[in-house]
Structures are given as C-alpha cells and as structure tokens.
Amino acid sequence: MTLIAIFLAVLLDWLIGDPYSWPHPVKWMGSYIYLCMRLQEKKQFSPYLFGFFLWLTTVGLALGVSCGLLWLAGLAHPVLYWLVWIYLAYASLAAKSLAFEAQKVYHTLKFGTLEEARKQVGMIVGRETSQLTPEEISKATIETVAENTSDGVIGPLLCLFLGGPILAMTYKAINTLDSMVGYKTEKYRKIGLISAKMDDLANLIPARLTWLFLILSSQILLLDVKGALRIGWRDRYQHASPNSAFSEAVVAGALGIQLGGPHVYHGELIEKPTIGEDSRPVEADDIQTAISLLYTSTMTGLILFTLFYLVMQAYF
C-alpha cells in the first residue's frame, strides 16, 4: 500500500499542485515562523538561543502534528489513515506548484512588462528583484527551479520512501526554516545559523541524488549531457551551501548557460560564485527547459526509488 500511496501523492501533486485557497502544512509552518520572528523583533532575545528555539519548535511541531494526525486517523479507520497519509505525502511535494510559478514568470517575460516580471519572480526568490534585467529574471527563475528540484521534489520523495509523510513533513519544516531565516545578512546571520546548517545536513543526500537524476534527464531530453556532466562535476561546490550548486551546475551545463553571481538580499549585496560558462545569453525559453528537467528528474527519481524499494522489500 505504501507504493500505491506514494504514486497517488505524486499524481495529485502533478494534477492539482497547491491551490492558493487550500490549507497547506508549509503555509502553517511559515505562519508560525513569521509570528516567532515578530516576537523576536519585540523582545530581542539572544539571537543564537532564539534561533535554536525557533528550529526546535518548528521541526518538533511538524513531527508531532504529523504523528498525531496519522495516529488519530488510524484509531478512527484504516481508510482514513491512508487518506491522511496520502494528503501529507502530496503536501510535501512541490513539482506542480514550482513549475506553475516558473511558468508565470515565463509568460510575464514573454507577454507582460518588465515591472510585472520583476514582481512575479519576486514571489519565488529571496533576492531583491526591483532592478533585475530580463536575463537576470530568467536566471533567477532557472536557479530556483534547479535548486527546488532537490528541496521541493527529490528530497521529499526520498523521505516518503524512507520514512513516510512523518519524515517528509519534518524535512519540509527544515527546508522552510532555511528559506525564511537561513540568510547570511546582518538580520538573519545569527538567528538563522542553525536553520541553515541543519538544512545543509538534511540535503546532503537529496542534492547528490538530484545531481544524478538531472544528468539522466539531460540525456532523456536530448540536451547537452556532456556539458551537464562536465559543469555538474566542476561547479558542484560553487555555492556557499554545500548542496545548492549540485543541481544548478547540472542545469547550467545542460543548457549551456551561466548562473549564480552576486545578488542583493534584504538590502545587502551578497557575493556568490558563478556556475557554468557564459557562452550565450540566458533567455526566457530556458525556463521551459528547466521545467522539463524538473518533471523528467521527478519521474526518474520515482522509478529508481521504486526499484530500490522493491529490491529491499524482496531481500530484507
């Protein structure tokens, strides 16, 4: 039943994504983190201690609520248990919502104004976007799709196979903390330290699996697989995070473009190394290719994880 539940969760994610009006665990996590940060602004606790408290309570709540919901559902009826299981699993995946948001940036670049495109990309990236050029908007979108292929899809999918929705929701809490407070700016450097470090740890394996799946997907989509391999290997550590460049490097190599470089976060210029080679301008159409890589790597991961799961079930 576990395999069927995972496949149904992936199917639901691909079909409906995350409608804005629907309740969603990650939204609740984000609201809790936001409220805690408002409290910190008023009370000015020790930033390191508050950062630890924020991480511990957010992850603890995600773990505890997931366990509690499944336990209560199991007490009520086995069918309800699996319905809750599938919902939590579906909510942990973000392929459709990621592709949908990237598509909105693409359509705004192609058919809207530059100001609209800047606002649209600002919905999915943490950097300041008010001065971005069309090429920089395309780069930012591709970087987000590439990085979140690991954080938003392959990582949760791996967790579902290893520990079900409880592990997947715990993983999502760790990711959400990093995305909200894990910055190196003056405001977040101390508060977000533990969130950033724990996110690095949680994504060590998913990032490297995503690297492999993206290379395989580059071959399936008849992209530059040699470039994906070469740049993917050469530039896999060209990032402050030990994980983020793994997926970005493969995508940059497969598309023959350059990503990365300095960005402005919360009013501060943060220097970042470049990834890939500046062989041609980055275009809006490259966003579509990045989305194709997202979906293909998701299917590749699902197939390979399933095969591994079946082998483990047969022999252990």
Curated annotation (Swiss-Prot):
Its record classes its membrane topology as: Multi-pass membrane protein
Gene Ontology CC terms: plasma membrane
Transmembrane domains' residue ranges: 45-65, 78-100, 151-171, 209-229, 291-311
- Where does it localize? Cell membrane
A GO biological process this protein is involved in? cobalamin biosynthetic process
The alphabetical list of record keywords is:
Cell membrane, Cobalamin biosynthesis, Membrane, Transmembrane, Transmembrane helix
For this UniProt entry, the molecular function terms from Gene Ontology, in alphabetical order, are:
ABC-type vitamin B12 transporter activity; threonine-phosphate decarboxylase activity
Pathway this chain belongs to: Cofactor biosynthesis; adenosylcobalamin biosynthesis
Q: Which domain of life is it from?
A: Bacteria
What protein family is recorded? Belongs to the CobD/CbiB family.
The name this protein carries in UniProt is Cobalamin biosynthesis protein CobD
Gene from which this protein is expressed: cobD
